[in-house]
Amino acid sequence: MCAHKKVLFSLFASFFGFTVANATTVKLGTSDLCLKAAIPVAKRLNTPRGLLQAISLKETGRWDQKRGMSYPWPWTVTAGGKGIYFATKKEAIDKVQALRQKGVRNIDVGCMQINLHYHPNAFDNLDQAFDPLTNTRYAANFLTNLYKNNGSWNLAIERYHSGNTESGTKYRKAVIHLKEHAAG
């Protein structure tokens, strides 16, 4: 396995709980914050392995030409169906404030794209909303409650995205594909 592929494999394997012999050490950066945040949250809430990472990738995935793969991005803001990736947390917060000043209310933020309109009490402030661990923890608690209420992780994934069955089903299929692809 070439060094580049070994680094990528090692990075994803560590996020999904696999041990890699002779793995190259990988320094985590902004592009790794969402995946890193999901690890302790998933363990604490006993969500299926790789599910939070796959949802984060589906919600905020962006392509990295150097890595040759997509990764979730913590400073993502989505409004009007358009996701925007910002270089810093401050830029993302500034964008949300500007959108709110324009009267836009339906805004998704952070690693797990929590909707600030439908989840108005999720965070005390925008700094918390964009904190990868806090954002992921809220999403995982919400997802776990959906699982308890629906009796199925598949339904929980669908409802996490939408109450619309058709849209939810498409979303679930995409998330499961990402989960299986990254773990396999």
Language model: regions and residue ranges:
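Bacterial N-terminal signal peptides
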Residues: S10-G17
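Bacterial N-terminal signal peptides that target proteins for export
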Residues: M1-L8
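Catalytic glycan-binding domains that act on GlcNAc-containing polysaccharides
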Residues: T24-G184
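Sec/Tat signal peptide C-region and signal peptidase I cleavage site
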Residues: T19-A23
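Generic low-polarity alpha-helical segments
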Residues: M1, G17, L51-L52
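General helical structural elements
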Residues: F9-S10, I176
